[in-house]
Amino acid sequence: MAPTRKFFVGGNWKMNGRKKCLGELICTLNAANVPAGTEVVCAPPTAYIDFARQKLDPKIAVAAQNCYKVTNGAFTGEISPGMIKDLGATWVVLGHSERRHVFGESDELIGQKVSHALAEGLGVIACIGEKLDEREAGITEKVVFEQTKVIADNVKDWSKVVLAYEPVWAIGTGKTATPQQAQEVHEKLRGWLKSNVNDGVAQSTRIIYGGSVTGATCKELASQPDVDGFLVGGASLKPEFVDIINAKQ
């Protein structure tokens, strides 16, 4: 019997919001029904991690959107996993396509960050995904498997890892992978984990989808057997995020 994977919904607020509007969003989330079978995590901008943790109901966890690969030091503008934990956050998003493509983070650096964050006791939402030209060239699998390998090489305990598949061409573009496209990649990723890690990890690791997820698209995506939740961008700042949290209901 395959283990039941708890549905996981992450809200990535990116570089958005001020205390007033985020406070209003938090009030909406605190009043929302969060199903017992769903884990919800919100990732505010670094400046608002403490604010979000103090205001959010304990049923919703808090994540950082990034961290560095060491504990302390002369790294201007960076934040360490220890600092993130000190603020009450328990997760970190690593390898997001915007970190890869806007800020030039390499697979190697992302792997080092994953290793350090896990060693420090944070849960990791590890992001992978292909660009449009890579999908059109037919190398989606090659790209996401290479990205996954670097992450896997740095993971000792998979119970603290959620894999987020985000086709880069679907992020912030309004284009969503079809449920069938998402399922196909998720199924292949689970197969990769089975072949390259082990069957237990493949069965228990949650693989979530990111890329223009909305209240309108979430239910059909959530019905796919290998889609274990979502990493939501723009829609996580709107009341429809509550609909996405309840996509399995």
Swiss-Prot record:
Modification N6-succinyllysine, positions: K149, K156, K194
PANTHER family: TRIOSEPHOSPHATE ISOMERASE
Positions of post-translational N6-methyllysine modification: K194
Residues where substrate binds: N12, K14
Reactions performed catalytically: dihydroxyacetone phosphate = methylglyoxal + phosphate; D-glyceraldehyde 3-phosphate = dihydroxyacetone phosphate
Residues modified as N6-acetyllysine: K14, K156, K194, K238
Highest classification ranks of the organism: Eukaryota, Metazoa, Chordata, Craniata, Vertebrata
Highest taxon of source: Eukaryota
Function: Triosephosphate isomerase is an extremely efficient metabolic enzyme that catalyzes the interconversion between dihydroxyacetone phosphate (DHAP) and D-glyceraldehyde-3-phosphate (G3P) in glycolysis and gluconeogenesis. It is also responsible for the non-negligible production of methylglyoxal a reactive cytotoxic side-product that modifies and can alter proteins, DNA and lipids.
Keyword annotations of the record: Acetylation, Cytoplasm, Gluconeogenesis, Glycolysis, Isomerase, Isopeptide bond, Lyase, Methylation, Nitration, Phosphoprotein, Ubl conjugation
CDD domains attached to this UniProt entry: TIM
Localization per record: Cytoplasm
Pfam annotation, one family: TIM
Subunit field text: Homodimer.
One MF term in the entry's GO annotations: ubiquitin protein ligase binding
Protein family according to the UniProt entry: Belongs to the triosephosphate isomerase family.
Biological pathway: Carbohydrate degradation; glycolysis; D-glyceraldehyde 3-phosphate from glycerone phosphate: step 1/1; Carbohydrate biosynthesis; gluconeogenesis
Residues modified to Phosphothreonine: T173, T214
Outcome recorded upon mutating L193Q: 50% reduced activity
E.C. number(s) listed in UniProt: 5.3.1.1, 4.2.3.3
Cellular component GO terms, alphabetical: cytosol
Cystine pairs: none
Residues carrying Phosphoserine: S80, S106, S159, S212, S223
Signal sequence region: none
Residues at the active site: H96 (electrophile), E166 (proton acceptor)
Name of this chain's protein: Triosephosphate isomerase
Cross-link (Glycyl lysine isopeptide (Lys-Gly) (interchain with G-Cter in SUMO1)) at residue(s): K142
